[in-house]
Amino acid sequence: MKSYLRLLWGIALLGCCACTTSQDRTTLLEVSPRSVVLPHEGGDEWIELQADGAWTSEVSPPIAREWLTTEPASGGAGKHRVRLHVAPNADFAQRDASVYFDAAELSQVVAVTQAPTLVTPGRLELPALNTTEYLTVGSASEPLEVTLSPQAEWCTAVVEGARMRIRVSTNLGAERSVTLHVTAGRFTQDVVLVQRAFDPARNYGDGEVVALQRATSGNGVCLVVVGDGYTLAEMARGTGKYETDMRRAAEAFFSVYPYSAYRSYFDVYMLTAISEEAGMSCVSPSETVDTKFSTLWQGVSTSISCDDGAVRDWLTRVT
């Protein structure tokens, strides 16, 4: 009889243990999304996790833990938001890793990809004068596409092999900026270009009138000295090429008789004129230069022509 009771008691205990084990078993582990792509500059992505038991996470391969972290790294039953954080990626190669979520015998994996750096630097400051600079282009598997936002006529961006040519025209106003949207397949990167403001304290602006001499005899005969084919880079006050050349031109004028004898009768003015490009156009050999007055040299002798109407209109700035 005692043996029979012991057998019944053992069966009851076994049933209780089996029941307890069944109730404690983890049967639910869900994560979403299963794959994420993060930008090269770094950032966060959130994973929605639901489990009915304790869970843990692990980043693989181990070297990826230098740039990828999870928070929290573990938890209990319930719904959780797990933050995936990636550090900036300065390399021209994409990063790939996996985050494994485990709960008892259940496992889920999230694939993590971080975009590569497409071009460097990510921000470029440019001078006020027209200039050309270059960005370094990475070895992306997809061809690069570039758009400007907002559209800016003063800026162009062209990919040339392993570099991107940036060209800006002269800025005579306030500081301005534009964003380059660079795309290579599914990866994107924004590059900010800032062109500095024109500094009137250090440079002459377009169409400024500067008195080089005042008449001390008579009513004053007006003489205006103006040049063509000078860019903003040559407009420094006092030391720039434009002012130096205009003063030399005035001195050359008064070095010839009879002007040398009557110099005191003249009011002499320098009128600034800023061109997009330096120099002048030429017929032979053929060369076109974008200048204020379209000055053209025939290529032989000293024959030079220009847009006379544009010059006359410009001279009206001197009153």
For each feature predicted by the language model, list its residue ranges.
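Bacterial Sec-dependent N-terminal signal peptides
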Residues: 17-37, 104-109
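A short beta-strand micro-motif common to beta-rich folds, especially ectodomain repeats
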Residues: 93-105, 174-185
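Short, solvent-exposed loop/linker segments at the N-terminal edge
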Residues: 36-42, 125-130
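Short, surface-exposed loop/turn segments at beta-strand-coil junctions that are enriched for proline
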Residues: 87-93, 169-174
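Sec-dependent bacterial lipoprotein signal peptides
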Residues: 1-17
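Interdomain boundary/hinge segments at the C-termini of tandem beta-sandwich modules
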Residues: 110-116, 191-197
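Zn2+-dependent metallopeptidase catalytic core
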Residues: 199-319
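Surface-exposed binding patches on compact interaction domains or structured appendages
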Residues: 26-29, 52-83, 141-165
